[in-house]
Amino acid sequence: MSRALLRSVLELRTPVTRLPPSFLLPFRPAARFLHQTAQQVEPTSQSDAAAAAATLLKASPPKVTTATTPEAPAAVPTSTPFSQQPPISQQVKELLPVLAAQPGHYTTIHIHGKPYLVTEGDTVKLPFKMPGVAPGDVLRLNRASVIGSRDLTLQGAPYVDERLFECRAIVMGTESEPMRVMIKKKRRCRKKKHVFSKHKYTVLRINQLKINDVSSL
């Protein structure tokens, strides 16, 4: 036998120990090793720590906080004091005694923003129930836009100075209206709803309407 034939026969008898190509092998990530070095801190003695704490306390003094109570808002005055009101003009001082001497005074009083033309002895039925009043209380009405008589009229801008007149009313009581029944119904619906209402009104009587004297102002 030739040498080439003998060599091929020997290769067939021996087991194959060769590895497959690299692209057929399973993927294995490369192992990475991280080396961490612990930081070594030199221990300090207890005396050094106490001295450092004492210096920190001396350098930063303790802060003292005081609790402050919130201040209540100042109440808005309903009427201006007489000392803060502007002076009365000379023309008003001259004509005010003439107006006071005439009979039959009338005034337009404003109560809760609504005007009422009244004279002394009139009864006013307010369209609401005034809170905080009881029968027998006397109220001073200091918002008047007009004060006049048959010949003279004093017009305010928008109100007459409250030092020029005095208008007082006494609370007579409260009146209630008859019971109202309102029927509410929707279209294409047989159901009806009855709403009952009965409002109350405060009644006042003007018992004083006087124009003050100029000398007392």
Curated annotation (Swiss-Prot):
Q: Which GO terms describe its cellular component?
A: mitochondrial large ribosomal subunit
Positions of region (Disordered): 61-87
- State the InterPro entries in the record: bL21-like, bL21-like_sf
Any one Pfam family here would be Ribosomal_L21p
The organism sits in which domain of life?
A: Eukaryota
Kindly report the protein's main subcellular placement as a broad class.
mitochondrion
Name the UniProt key words of this record, in alphabetical order.
Mitochondrion
Which residue stretches, if any, does this entry annotate as coiled coil? Answer: none
* Cellular compartments annotated: Mitochondrion
- List the molecular function annotations (GO) for this entry: structural constituent of ribosome
- Low complexity biased stretches: 61-81
Q: How does it assemble?
A: Component of the mitochondrial large ribosomal subunit (mt-LSU). Mature N.crassa 74S mitochondrial ribosomes consist of a small (37S) and a large (54S) subunit. The 37S small subunit contains a 16S ribosomal RNA (16S mt-rRNA) and 32 different proteins. The 54S large subunit contains a 23S rRNA (23S mt-rRNA) and 42 different proteins.
Chain's role: Component of the mitochondrial ribosome (mitoribosome), a dedicated translation machinery responsible for the synthesis of mitochondrial genome-encoded proteins, including at least some of the essential transmembrane subunits of the mitochondrial respiratory chain. The mitoribosomes are attached to the mitochondrial inner membrane and translation products are cotranslationally integrated into the membrane.
What family does the database annotate? Belongs to the bacterial ribosomal protein bL21 family.
- Provide the protein name: Large ribosomal subunit protein bL21m
What are the top taxonomic ranks of the organism?
Eukaryota, Fungi, Dikarya, Ascomycota, Pezizomycotina
